[in-house]
């Protein structure tokens, strides 16, 4: 009977305390640092916490079977669907330090269960340096430390999905690797407002079961936490990724100019290209500005990426396995890309109502434009077409744990000479989502 009562009290404590989970992937919520003397009755469980959220939703597309980045493409004969976008449960454990109020170690395990199956999303261990409380080491499966949108948890992101560029270049956001972080925990430290991450990752993320070559991605990010001045705050960061993957063939296509002056892909078929590294380099910068009012807040976010992305003739998506067709490796296409995300968030009337505006674009090949794509002999494909998405949304907060999200995403594509892309596609999506977090 005592064990049953203890378990019940523990469940109530964990549930109540875990409403505020960490806002960013792989971060540790400071409210989780609980001393054994706070609640002696449940001190054996005080450092264990269970959090999670569920996102059932209904969507309507502007046409049947569209390719979409709003939760995945629609079935060939369908333009509406109910789906369980995410349903996640996360177990966290913090090992208290004997010398400070900060943890000595932190373990996290998160699973995602939907109608499409169950998959692991996080499984990592974070060790803290407890003498000066400045450094930590993370190893396992966790979020890549690149950019703001990629690391903002889906439990807190206002629009239903991350931008197209995030999903193509950083599919599923996480990867297996190890990372060192500099983040002074003492607020009196002059650098306590800064965080620096530096990590090595396999590169394939959750899109592959194992690393298909020995090349690793080096990812770093320096982030300035919100600097507050009265009701105004500003934060921002710089990110860098340097990696790549091995060419499976000797054929490597790069941007060039044809004899008639057209922008084309030119093939390099040097035998030495086999097993050479196709460069993958990203550069990113982001800023977040927020103004608080008695009745709510106004927030603006901007983020810009550019760099080099290896892919195939048909896609610029970062691969989880070596790209092949009929068992044979595919030629590598090197593209130079850029893209951005812009958010505007505004409370209206009070904190229960929030208006959302978002704009993002992804240009997979900045060396070519519009009618150049689709010309015979250029080797250009739909994978070189620029897409932009404008989104408008509304959130109604029923309570601290429950909200209703309504959004409409309008997608525009470059008008090209490519069959099927000589006009605007009909691929807009309306989403109605119920979001509950615990």
Regions found by a protein language model. Give the residues of each.
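Outer-membrane beta-barrel biogenesis signature
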Residues: 19-51, 62-71, 249, 401-402, ...
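Bacterial Sec-dependent N-terminal signal peptides
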Residues: 1-24
């Amino acid at each position: 009977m005592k064990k049953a009562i203890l378990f019940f009290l523990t469940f109530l404590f964990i549930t109540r305390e875990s409403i505020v989970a960490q806002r960013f992937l792989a971060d540790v919520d400071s409210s989780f640092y609980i001393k054994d003397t706070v609640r002696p009755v449940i001190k054996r469980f005080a450092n264990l916490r269970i959090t999670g959220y569920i996102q059932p939703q209904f969507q309507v597309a502007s046409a049947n079977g569209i390719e979409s980045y709003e939760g995945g493409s629609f079935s060939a004969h369908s333009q509406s669907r109910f789906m369980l976008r995410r349903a996640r449960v996360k177990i966290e454990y913090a090992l208290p330090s004997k010398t400070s109020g900060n943890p000595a170690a932190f373990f996290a395990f998160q699973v995602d269960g939907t109608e499409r199956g169950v998959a692991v999303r996080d499984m990592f261990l974070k060790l803290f340096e407890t003498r000066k409380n400045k450094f930590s080491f993370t190893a396992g499966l966790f979020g890549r430390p690149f950019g703001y949108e990629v690391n903002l948890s889906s439990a807190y992101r206002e629009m239903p999905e991350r931008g197209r560029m995030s999903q193509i270049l950083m599919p599923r956001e996480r990867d297996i690797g190890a990372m060192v972080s500099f983040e002074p925990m003492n607020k009196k430290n002059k650098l306590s407002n800064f965080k620096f991450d530096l990590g090595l990752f396999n590169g394939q993320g959750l899109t592959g079961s194992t690393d298909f070559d020995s090349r690793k991605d080096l990812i770093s990010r320096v982030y300035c936490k919100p600097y507050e001045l009265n009701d105004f705050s500003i934060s921002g960061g710089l990110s860098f990724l340097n990696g790549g993957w091995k060419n499976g063939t000797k054929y490597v296509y790069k941007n060039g100019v044809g004899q008639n002056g057209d922008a084309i892909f030119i093939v390099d078929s040097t035998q030495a290209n086999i097993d050479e590294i196709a460069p993958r380099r990203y550069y990113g910068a982001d800023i977040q500005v927020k103004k608080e009012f008695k009745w709510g807040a106004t927030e603006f976010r901007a983020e810009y990426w550019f760099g080099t992305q290896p892919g195939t003739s048909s896609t610029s998506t970062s691969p989880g396995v070596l790209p092949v067709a009929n068992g044979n490796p595919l030629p590598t296409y090197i593209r130079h890309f850029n893209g951005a995300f812009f958010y505007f968030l505004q409370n209206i009337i009070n904190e229960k109502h929030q208006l959302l505006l978002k704009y993002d674009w992804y240009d997979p090949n900045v060396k070519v434009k519009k009618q150049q794509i689709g010309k015979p002999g250029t080797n250009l494909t739909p994978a070189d077409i620029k897409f932009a998405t404008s989104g408008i949304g509304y959130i109604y907060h029923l309570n601290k744990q429950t909200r209703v999200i309504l959004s409409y995403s309008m997608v525009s594509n470059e008008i090209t000479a490519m069959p099927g892309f000589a006009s605007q596609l009909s691929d807009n999506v309306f989403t109605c989502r119920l979001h509950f977090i615990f």
